[in-house]
Curated annotation (Swiss-Prot):
Its main location: membrane. GO terms for molecular function: MHC class II protein complex binding; peptide antigen binding. It comes from the Eukaryota. It is found in: Membrane. The chain crosses the membrane at residues 195-215. One of its GO terms (cellular component) is lysosomal membrane. The keyword Protease does not apply. This is Rano class II histocompatibility antigen, A beta chain. Keywords: Adaptive immunity, Glycoprotein, Immunity, Membrane, MHC II, Transmembrane, Transmembrane helix. The lineage of its organism: Eukaryota, Metazoa, Chordata, Craniata, Vertebrata. It comes from Rattus norvegicus. PANTHER family: HLA CLASS II HISTOCOMPATIBILITY ANTIGEN, DQ BETA 1 CHAIN, MHC CLASS II-RELATED. Residues 216-233 are cytoplasmic. Involved in the presentation of foreign antigens to the immune system. Residues 1-194 are extracellular.
Length: 233
């Protein structure tokens, strides 16, 4: 009689910031073969494991499968297991709205909600117009991996803005105690012009105020005595 055993282990550092996958194989309670993702190949621990290691290390698809298990097994199990929130890695998303073209009322346009640097991957992004959810004209990219285990996604809304419309990007994520909302308000060209004029007037006012204070300061100082001899002609 003999007993063959397999143990698959996952080790986590700071949530899933770093994952290590270990595959251990035993014959009659003696470990004879091991795969460690930090090593990247099978290593024989006894003479019995030598032929296994040589065979499996020569098969590229087997090694690729073992490397993929960090995501397909370890990461998946971590995210699906009921781990206490205090032990999970959570990264809050950054949310911003941008317009694809210069704003013009009553013209077709595209609003882009950029949601970046969040973890875990599960996230819900919705668009609202004047408090009502928009379901048509919504297009989303696939989740994009940043390379540091965090993710980003773009959710776009095709729209034709009317004066006074308020568009809201609404984001739900496990890292948030309450949803994050970012608003974008449609403005007429005259309103934008008035706003820009107001900003320009404010800037000019600050410049003239500073110039006036400078001149007043110079006058208050007055003459500082006669010039040195030889400078008066």
């Amino acid at each position: 009689d003999f007993v063959y055993q397999f143990k698959g282990l996952c080790y986590y550092t700071n949530g899933t910031q770093r994952i290590r996958s270990v595959d251990r194989r035993f014959y009659n309670q003696e470990e004879f073969l091991r795969y460690d993702s930090d090593v990247g190949e099978f290593r024989a621990l006894t003479e019995l494991g030598r032929s296994w290691a040589d065979d499996w290390n020569s098969q590229k698809e087997i090694l690729e499968q073992k490397r993929a298990e960090m995501d397909t097994v370890c990461r998946y199990n971590y995210e699906e297991t009921e781990v206490p929130t205090s032990l999970r890695r959570l990264e809050r998303p950054n949310v911003a709205i941008s317009l694809s073209r210069t704003e013009a009322l009553n013209h077709h346009n595209l609003l882009v909600c950029s949601v970046t640097d969040f973890y875990p991957a599960q996230i819900k992004v919705r668009w609202f117009r004047n408090g009502q959810e928009e379901t048509t004209g919504v297009v989303s990219t696939q989740l994009i991996k940043n390379g540091d285990w965090t993710f980003q996604i773009l959710v776009m809304l095709e729209m034709t803005p009317q004066r006074g419309d308020v568009y809201t990007c609404h984001v739900d994520h496990a890292s948030l105690e309450s949803p994050v909302t970012v608003e974008w308000r449609a403005q007429s060209e005259s309103a934008q012009s008035k706003m820009l004029s107001g900003i320009g007037g404010l800037v000019l006012g600050v410049i003239f105020l500073g110039l006036g204070l400078f001149i007043r300061h110079k006058r208050q100082k007055g003459p500082q005595g006669p010039p040195p001899a030889g400078l008066l002609q």
